Amino acid sequence: MPIKFHEESKTFHIYNKHLSYITCIMENGQMENLYYGKAIRDKEDFSYLHEEIMRSLMAVCVPEPGLLSMQYTKQEYPVYGTGDYRNPALTVRQENGSEIVDFKYVSHEIYGGKKKLAGLPATYTESDEEATSLDITLHDSVMDTDLVLTYSVYEDYPVITRSARLVQKGDQKIRLENVMSAAVEFPDMDYEMIHLSGAWARERYVKTRKLEMGTQAVQSLAGTGSSSEQNPFIALKRPHTTEDTGEVFGFSFVYSGNFLAQVEVSTYEMTRVMMGINPQGFSWELSRDEEFQTPEVVMVYSDKGLNGMSQAYHRLYRDRLMRGKWRNHARPILLNNWEATYFDFNEEKILNIAKKAKEVGVELFVLDDGWFGTRNDDYQGLGDWFVNKNKLPNGISGLSRKIEEMGLKFGLWVELEMVNKNSDCYRAHPDWLIGAPDRFESHSRHQHVLDFSRPEVVDFIYDSISKVIEESSISYIKWDMNRYMSEPFSRGASAADQGKTMHKYILGVYELYTRLTERFPDILFESCASGGARFDPGMLYFAPQTWTSDDTDAAEREKIQYGTSFVYPIVSMGSHVSAVPNHQLHRTTPLSTRANVAYFGTFGYELDLNLLSAKEIEEVKAQVEFMKEHRDLIQVEGDFYRILSPFEGNDTAWMVVSRDKKQAVAGYYERLNKVNASWMRLRFKGLDEDQLYKVKWEDKCLKAYGNELMYAGIPVDRDYCNKTNGDFHSVLYTIEAED
């Protein structure tokens, strides 16, 4: 088993061929982190890694002459009230007002496989041989409370997962005010922190900062989602780490609500990383025999740079986070009508768009917002999940049947968590809104948040949308969510339980997803939240793809998809070819570039094909054929490599290489044209050095060995004035091994 407990030294060694994680029981019964990094050989005793010295102002937590001080110890799960003045992973308020806790080792269990987390998404195993898990039980004798720290290490991935569970065994009521899922301490601060930040239409831009003494953090307080502003992910990399070399530690949170990812550097240059539910607005009371389970943190170690980290996340999330029929399954090429029609459509217009989609080879037609209630604009209709017969006199069932008769699958847009005040749902249940009755209810996009912390609300929405699905032939659902939670108050909860509202809301979303995916296992779900405001691992557990951003401009998507690839696999990224001028930026980019960007995702169209010229239609047909030929490689079978960063210059490049290194597809993108430009070579990655390849691009062909293509590279074509290419030029390369 790749987890060993050495009794004499009281040390746990969690390891596989990639990494080692070592923790031990200290003399005061608490847990210390000794090492996390590249795999090292197991042995009985690693106690030399414990560092202890007399320092000024230290609070010693063992009898004299001991020198153990929590302030200067790399703790496994730091708590408040034992002489550590850094931020704790756990804060518990007791009946007497005290927040002092002291959890000491009681027992542990090592077992094969991985347990499910009740009510929460998490990575999983399909056999006990795939992973080994460790539960360490600690106990606070004053509160009579157990703290269970859970670790799982996969056999074939450089991954350790972490979570924590509190179990109240005593009679007093305790209140959890801060419960992190994981904490990790490093002995130095020589790292740079990477995070993915942005806003609506520019999600997950790559940001890097050097660690400094003090606290640096990213977080979400959006309530309904992990947010566009910050993604629930951070990484620590060494300063000289590149895409392909050097150490990096990734931390990804399998959760879709408020989160905190925090890095604190002490005055002695120790680095503490913590990740979990954001304590702001969170409070959870536990009575006797009640427990609280935190979401999971997925930690990746790579000594092969940022690409190595990303590929580990991609493989794990593709293989052991996504589930069901669509796991490791290429996606259908779709056309969505939103940017073609917005709310202004009827059955005839929809059928005309669908007919043209079928002619070019599209496989799935998706009807977006506007099909239900009185939904003629975004002021009304949300919450009323019944068909607007004025637009669709034959209903969704009639429309879906006609679409299927064309030879297309049919998909539908929904926004199940929201309500307009101008709706039957609100008029019947005004108390179902999130918000305090004595406060103004802020609106966003003219809508309000339904209280999914209440089971009766989830039941109502489940029954409403299930009826629509049952009566129709639906193969795909796009589940949108277009606002944050501004006044987090539940009219269905007591004063003591208001701190549970935001977490229970997310649990309600997960409950509805669970019920719908179990009842309709063949439907492909795509999550969406004003674009990418809820692009997180928690969503991928239920919906194996996410609408990456509402910004469909090809040039902007280069940055968005590049950043998203740090954690999320290509097959999870919703990516469409849209009309020009682009509806978000009014920018015009070539049709070829729009496709060359969208290929590296789920691929589809978001425009009215009837408005294209005959030449453009032929180009679209060729694009569809290309994607059908290469989508297994791009979406399922290949490893993704970042080559040139759009955040560092005018050029972007990336590629996907098959696991056997026999096939690859690469994309190169130049943002703005340059006159009399310098020479440039594009160097591929991930190929077999000794394999002869045939490379095709545009009207050119080259035969070269893998080492040539990776180290010498291919010259990027330019002419003196570069009149041919223009702005936003791109090149697609196909690479095939020669026998």
What role is predicted for each listed range?
Residues 5, 9-13, 17, 31-264, ...:
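Polysaccharide-binding surfaces and accessory modules of carbohydrate-active proteins
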Residues 71-72, 76, 81-117, 245-258, ...:
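Glycine-rich, aromatic-flanked loop segments that form ligand/cofactor-binding clefts
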Residues 234, 243, 646-689:
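Carbohydrate-binding surface patches
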Residues 326-460, 476, 486:
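Aromatic-lined carbohydrate-binding/catalytic grooves of carbohydrate-active enzymes
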Residues 672-739:
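C-terminal beta-sandwich/jelly-roll accessory domains of carbohydrate-active enzymes
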Residues 18, 164, 289, 335, ...:
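Conserved, mostly hydrophobic/aromatic
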Residues 393-395, 427-429, 433-588, 602, ...:
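Active-site neighborhood of glycoside hydrolase catalytic domains
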Residues 98-105, 284-303, 728-735:
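Short Pro-Gly-centered flexible turn/kink motifs
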